[in-house]
Amino acid sequence: MVFTHIPKKAELFTGIIQGKGEILFSKQFSDGLKLRVLMNELGTGLELGASVAVSGVCLTVVNFQGAWAEFDVIQETLDRSNLEMLQVGSHTNIERSLKMGDELGGHQVNGHIDCRAQILQIEQSPRNRKIWIELAPHWNRYLVPKGWIAVDGVSLTVVDVESDRFSVCLIPETLSRTTLGNATQTTHLNLEFDHQTKVIVESIERILPKFLEKVT
């Protein structure tokens, strides 16, 4: 995947998970949540204000010491994501933000979660796993077979798209390297639809009616 333009202060991710973190502390406030995450070696070189994708959610480091980092999560993010559901001891997918010169694997992920959705069905094959995820009808227009989606921060290819659900396939590397390997039918996942697809779809929806008015 080649990005045609990366702003100097881009807070971008690729959906290639670098490791798993562990929730050490979670405290609810009236307007949000504070999380402390054990990042292990991924905490090396961390700075205040750095961006880290935690289960696909772009969060800002507000405090750190050794191998852990703290993040403040606003209510709007909690409403859209599964971060509020994470318990102490839970594991999360971790990706540090993209730096100039990094390999551009996966696809462009912004860390801005669109919604959370529950796994409906899991189909296990000898080595791989297909998961079916619920899909509210108004999100359907952003998904196409073979298109991109970030699921809990993991860059995945869409396999099937139906009116109320879609599927992705997980290879052994993804199952072992990310938290998706432990996901069950009760698991809620963070979804971020491909940004370029959203821009195209929303632009067409906005412009096409005006164009049709002129030609009819």
Could you describe each region identified by the protein language model?
Residues 2-216:
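Conserved loop->alpha-helix
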